[in-house]
């Protein structure tokens, strides 16, 4: 189906202290042409930075009903192409990509994907959460539960996001509309990055089968 992203509510997460990023995100929203923009204040939790990040995503996921886009405030426009074609069965579409994926309890260059066409891939374990289009409540609710757990254990919520992609219809634009200034491997087409499979997890992640 054809979707004009400018008609979708755009939510961006921004810390109160990051005034410059707030200004830059407001400018991004205008430049892209979003009609409904919502700022969600990010959470700072002393000594639990990752918990604050996960809580911020949790709050953003509860702001309105899907469809909506959640942005982190270090996004930059790469391709100003508001109208996109997406599959009718899509639960979510990553408008930004990452060259890193999650496999066998490791994060690295392990993104597994299936090419749909030149512009779209289905992803199964891709990390990153800087620009995601959420299309239905079931998927958004699952991501909300993951973000809640990320807050509870003070860990990256995007690890959980990556690990459930295989159970949903999650796609990514091969050539991203947005990239992340704080991360490498987010500004080129996903298929241009080398990828591999991690088949032998590090022993430190193994659990004993028996205790003696």
Region roles according to the model:
Residues 1-71, 75-212:
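An acidic/histidine-cluster motif and surrounding catalytic segment
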